[in-house]
Amino acid sequence: MARRILMCGALAVTVFLSSPALGDRTARTAAASQVGAPAETVRAIAPPTHPLPAETASAGVTKFSFIAYGDTRGRQDGTALQYEHGLIVDSMLATIKRLDTTAAPVRFVLQSGDAVVNGGDARQWNRSFVDLINRLTTGAGVPYFLAPGNHDVTSSADLNAAARQNGLRNYLAATAQLIPADGATRRLAGYPTYAFGYGNTFVVALDSNIAGDDTQFNWIKAQLDGLDRARYTNVIAFFHHPVLSSGPHGGSTVEPATLAIRTRYEPLFRQHHVRMTLTGHEHFYEHWVERYQDATGPHRMDHIVTGGGGAPLYSYQGEPSTKDLIAAGRDSKVSFEHLVKPGPAPGDNPYHYVVLSVDGDNIQLEVIGVDWGRGFAPYRSAKLQLGDGGR
């Protein structure tokens, strides 16, 4: 772990940097230690005081906001509350309060994974994560939805691996009062895979660590196949591994989970005109725009990487190749634009989260930098209109 001193006016800020090699060793150590973690029961995060209504009850809602972010794991997980994540939560609470009396209040929060360093260690959930999220669910009253990251349930594609099962058990305990119940219509039984609808927007959460799993894929496909698109004009998917990224997990590297997302879910998402993917894994902000055509005309899918939730920051490592994606989508005339690239140093990429404001089939995005990152303007401003109805 190295340090970099940033000068912000008269204020010197120390940023701790994590090299890709160190990040890889940390992930391997976390996975290896999960089996032998102490037997402590994970406390359930408190349910929101203002839960989402039944899907049918919100059918007429076309204007609201929600928050997205990811990668909150901290350097002191298991011994203290996550400090950097706490700064994020403080800012979120202020944003939720600011928007509460507007026409587009914040109705839920999405977290794309890596809640803690070692998801198999109950102490890390209990001492570093749960109480921070309680501030959102009880203090602000908003529903909170978490997708599992590789640090939460390991990156193993083997559903029965002991380390994965240990992490999954803790994840499910923490989220027991937040996500649909096991066996519910909007939950895949036995999996951390679920969906929900609010107003004109439908959200699917999947476990990208097992993106090659047939049972999960078929369930997601069935959810999308059966969707009332007259009502749900906006469909959003959130999960951990990005489709494209230019950090230590991307660039010339294509991880197995990423490859499975590209080959299996990308065509499915285009088929169903998914508006946006919200991911993390890379600890910075990045934005890709995918354009394609089908019998209904031109379409756009925004791929947002928002992994600035408190984990050690990453930097730009190189462009990923889009050649195979473009070749696979040749019939749909698929193309990609790298709209926002992360900076070349971790200190260029602040802790942040994203506010998405829905107004009919239009979505506006605002990136909010935190602490020394206040004023972060990746689009020469902090806001961007995401096309007209996904086109």
Task: Show which residues each predicted segment covers.
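Bacterial N-terminal signal peptides that target proteins for export
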Residues: 1-9
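Bacterial N-terminal signal peptides
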Residues: 8-17
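N-terminal active-site segment of His-dependent metallophosphoesterases
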Residues: 33-123
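Residue-level marker for buried hydrophobic side chains located in beta-strands
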Residues: 66-68, 109-111, 146-147, 237, ...
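Active-site glycine-centered loops adjacent to acidic/histidine catalytic or metal-binding residues
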Residues: 71, 113-114, 149-150, 240, ...
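Extended active-site neighborhood of metal-dependent phosphoesterases/phosphodiesterases
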Residues: 42-51, 79, 120-235, 250-260, ...
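Signal peptide processing junction and immediate N-terminal pro/mature segment
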Residues: 19-34
